Amino acid sequence: MNEDALEAVRSRTFFAILTVFYSIFRCCLAYCNKGDDDHLIHPSHSLHVIKATGINPSVLLSIPVVSFNANAFKDNIECVVCLSKFIDEDKARVLPSCNHCFHFDFTDTWLHSDYTCPNCRKNVEEIQNHELSLSPNPNSG
């Protein structure tokens, strides 16, 4: 066999082997991905919607709205929801479960859809009869 004929046989053999490996690869890929659409939601499946429930409205109403007094605090206090510093006469709520302070508009909006503090996630409904105050603790130096 001459050199050109041998080269043609090699090329055809290489192409045939490459085609076989490619076909095997595609079959394996199709087999491996066969059940991957099981996680998709089909219209016939029923969906269970989990709805976040907010705080009991009576508990929210029991948390008084107070006017902030900056002179009562040695450090500036910031609302962690809106990231603004409290200024004198800002209306605020102090959550009874953790004593975190927020502008009352933001607190009310949050608590209509969640029952925890937006800062520390403590349950706000746990301590309903807590006395609320924005004055500093007299025992803290």
Swiss-Prot record:
Pathway: Protein modification; protein ubiquitination. It is a single-pass membrane protein. Pfam families: zf-RING_2. It is found in: Membrane. Keywords: Membrane, Metal-binding, Transferase, Transmembrane, Transmembrane helix, Ubl conjugation pathway, Zinc, Zinc-finger. The chain crosses the membrane at residues 14-32. Its EC number is 2.3.2.27. InterPro entries: ATL10/ATL72-79-like, Znf_RING, Znf_RING/FYVE/PHD. One of its GO terms (cellular component) is plasma membrane. It catalyses: S-ubiquitinyl-[E2 ubiquitin-conjugating enzyme]-L-cysteine + [acceptor protein]-L-lysine = [E2 ubiquitin-conjugating enzyme]-L-cysteine + N(6)-ubiquitinyl-[acceptor protein]-L-lysine. A zinc finger (RING-type) spans 79-121. One of its GO terms (biological process) is negative regulation of short-day photoperiodism, flowering. GO terms for molecular function: ubiquitin-protein transferase activity; zinc ion binding. Belongs to the RING-type zinc finger family. ATL subfamily. The RING-type zinc finger domain mediates binding to an E2 ubiquitin-conjugating enzyme. This is Putative RING-H2 finger protein ATL62.
